[in-house]
Regions:
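A detector of single, family-specific signature residues
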Residues: 1-285
Length: 285
């Protein structure tokens, strides 16, 4: 008899629910959120597992890879689709969510999402880490500009390289302000240095990636945009055609139609926000 599994994942524990093809609950248990513990439950009895569902999330890629490597029919479900399916429950709990996911697997009411390869996950981590350091450095610079303006000290137009020297010049006659500014300048300097380290790693990856080099022949597309696109698409064969890529990035319009009303709205903004931001910058550069 076919069986279906729902996994409701949290940081420490995962709720597991196994149902048969008639929807009857066979087993419910909580285990540690570790591949070994989950595999032990799923392989403890010789059940014919048809589908194993888990919600897309921070830990789903790790668990999905481990279960797939073990030869289990695991499926990662799109978050918003799962939320809509489970919202009919009156009482929300990890146990009920796992039971709901198992029933979704049984009736086929789910929308699978692509789980990125390990290489793409590493590229993505490099890109987000670089973006984080860049954002924090800019936050410090903007904060210094704003706070010094309160004292009539205007930074003006100055580049990244000469920014620190300009700040020191402004506070030279204000020792109390200089004492406050100094830690911020040190923090900014360290952030900029480590940002450079990550950017050099990014350039090294792009330099040895044929697809990225080909993408960079497009006007406006630099190494950051190219690697972001490469990491987001991951496996091109998962798209039926080139138009599907735009829809996956949330760049297609939304439609709201009911009776005589038929409205075309703005873009859906589904999918990767970072990718849309990069494409926007590339289009305007």
């Amino acid at each position: 008899m076919q069986h279906y599994v729902g996994l409701d994942i949290s940081v420490k524990e995962t709720s597991v629910c196994i149902v048969d093809k008639a929807g009857k609950v066979i087993r419910e248990v909580k285990v540690a959120t570790e591949p070994v513990a989950i595999l032990a439950v799923l392989t403890e009895e010789p059940l014919a597992l048809e589908r194993i569902g888990l919600e897309a999330g921070p830990l789903s890629q790790w668990l999905y890879s481990a279960l797939a490597e073990a030869g289990l029919p695991v499926i990662c479900v799109e978050t918003r689709h799962m939320k809509a399916a489970l919202s009919a429950q009156i009482n929300k709990s990890d146990r009920n969510d796992a039971r709901g996911i198992a029933q979704m697997m049984r009736v086929g009411l789910y929308r699978p999402v692509h789980v990125k390869t390990l290489a793409s996950q590493k590229r993505r981590m490099l890109l987000t880490s670089r973006q984080l350091l860049q954002a924090k450095a800019l936050d410090i610079e903007n904060d210094l500009r704003g706070t010094l303006r309160n004292f009539g000290l205007k930074v003006g137009m100055v580049g990244t390289v000469k920014f620190e020297a300009r700040i020191r010049e402004l506070v030279a006659d204000h020792p109390d302000l200089a004492a406050i500014v100094e830690p911020l300048l040190i923090a900014r300097r360290v952030l900029r240095e480590q940002l450079g380290v990550l950017h050099r790693q990014l350039l090294e990856i792009v330099r040895h990636d044929e697809v990225c080099r080909r993408l960079m022949t497009t006007p406006g597309v630099g190494p950051v945009v190219a690697l972001t696109f490469r990491a987001t698409v991951d496996v091109p064969s998962r798209f039926s055609n080139s138009k599907a890529v735009g829809a996956a990035f949330g760049l297609t319009t939304c439609r709201q139609q009911s009776g005589e009303i038929d409205r075309m709205g703005g873009i859906s903004k589904c999918g990767d926000a970072m990718m849309r931001e990069m494409l926007f910058e590339a289009a305007w550069s």
